[in-house]
C-alpha cells in the first residue's frame, strides 16, 4: 500500500542551526524545503526547528518539549554531542526513528548519517597545510565563540584529526590558539593582531568550521597573503 493512497499523516522534525544568507546551513535548510515539497503528496509534513550553533542551551530548549506532540521521525544536526545523545536515547525509548546530519556519533541507533568523516577531514586539512609549510612553522588554530564556548562535535573531530596528523608526521613548530567572535570584526582584528605580532613564525592557519572568511578577511586586510589558510565549506564568503 503506497503512502500516497494512505490517509495517515506523517510528521517529521528537522533540528538544525539558524543561519544568515550565504551560510553553510542555508543550503541544508533549502534541501529540507525541497524534500518537504516533494513529500507533500505523500501526507508527510516537515517542521523545521532552529537553534544557535554557538549556544548549547538553545538546542536543549528546543528538545525539552519535543515529544509533547506527535512525531514520526527526526533529522538532527549533531553539533552538541551530549545533548544529541540524550535526545537520541529519548527517541529510542519512544521508538521514533532519527537520522544525523553534519557529523556522526557512534554508539547510537540512527538510521543513517549524512555528511563527511570529520576526523578524516581534519587529517586532510593538516596534510594540505603541511604540503605548503616547513615542519618548523607555527600554525594558528582559530575557533569561533558566541553565547558560550561550545565546540561542535564536527569541530572537535576535525581538530583531533588535524593534530594527530601533525604528531604522526614530525611537526615541530608551535600551535597557537585564538578565540574569535562571529560578528565582531573589531574584536577579531585586535586578537589576531596581538597573536601575530607576538608570534612572527606563524605561517599557517586553520579554522574547523565554515567561517574561514573571518580569518581570510583579516589576512587580506593586513596584506598577509603569505600565511597559508585552510578552512571548510564552499560558501560564497569563503571563496571570494
Feature map (PLM): residue ranges:
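Flexible loop/hinge segments that line or gate small-molecule binding clefts
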Residues: 83-120, 235-240
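Hydrophobic alpha-helical segments within soluble ligand-binding/sensing domains
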Residues: 113-139, 188-189, 236-240
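Short beta-strand elements in bilobed, periplasmic/extracellular small-molecule ligand-binding domains
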Residues: 36-56, 140-141, 163-186
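Basic, Lys/Arg-rich alpha-helical nucleic-acid-recognition elements, primarily the DNA-binding modules
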Residues: 1-2
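Hydrophobic alpha-helical
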Residues: 74-92, 162, 178-237
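Amphipathic helical "hinge" segments at domain boundaries
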Residues: 6-61
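Short helix-capping segments at alpha-helix termini
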Residues: 38-42, 94, 166-173, 199, ...
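An alpha-beta-alpha
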Residues: 125-169
Amino acid at each position: 500500500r503506497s503512502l500516497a493512497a494512505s490517509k495517515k499523516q506523517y510528521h517529521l522534525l528537522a533540528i538544525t542551526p539558524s543561519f544568515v544568507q550565504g551560510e553553510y546551513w542555508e543550503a541544508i535548510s533549502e534541501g529540507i524545503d525541497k524534500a518537504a515539497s516533494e513529500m507533500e503528496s505523500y501526507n508527510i509534513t516537515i517542521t523545521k526547528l532552529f537553534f544557535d550553533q554557538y549556544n548549547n542551551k538553545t538546542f536543549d530548549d528546543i528538545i525539552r518539549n519535543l515529544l509533547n506532540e506527535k512525531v514520526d521521525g527526526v533529522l538532527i544536526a549533531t553539533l552538541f554531542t551530549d545533548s544529541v545523545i540524550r535526545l537520541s536515547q529519548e527517541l529510542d525509548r519512544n521508538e521514533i526513528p532519527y537520522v544525523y546530519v553534519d557529523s556522526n556519533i557512534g554508539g547510537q541507533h540512527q538510521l543513517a548519517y549524512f555528511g563527511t568523516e570529520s576526523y578524516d577531514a581534519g587529517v586532510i586539512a593538516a596534510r594540505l597545510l603541511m604540503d605548503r609549510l616547513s615542519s618548523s612553522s607555527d600554525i594558528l588554530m582559530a575557533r569561533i565563540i558566541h553565547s558560550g564556548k561550545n565546540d561542535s562535535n564536527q569541530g572537535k573531530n576535525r581538530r583531533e584529526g588535524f593534530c594527530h596528523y601533525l604528531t604522526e608526521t614530525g611537526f615541530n613548530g608551535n600551535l597557537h590558539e585564538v578565540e574569535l567572535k562571529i560578528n565582531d570584526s573589531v574584536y577579531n582584528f585586535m586578537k589576531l593582531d596581538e597573536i601575530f605580532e607576538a608570534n612572527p613564525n606563524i605561517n599557517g592557519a586553520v579554522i574547523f568550521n565554515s567561517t574561514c572568511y573571518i580569518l581570510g578577511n583579516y589576512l587580506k586586510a593586513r596584506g598577509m597573503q603569505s600565511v597559508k589558510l585552510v578552512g571548510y565549506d564552499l560558501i560564497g564568503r569563503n571563496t571570494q
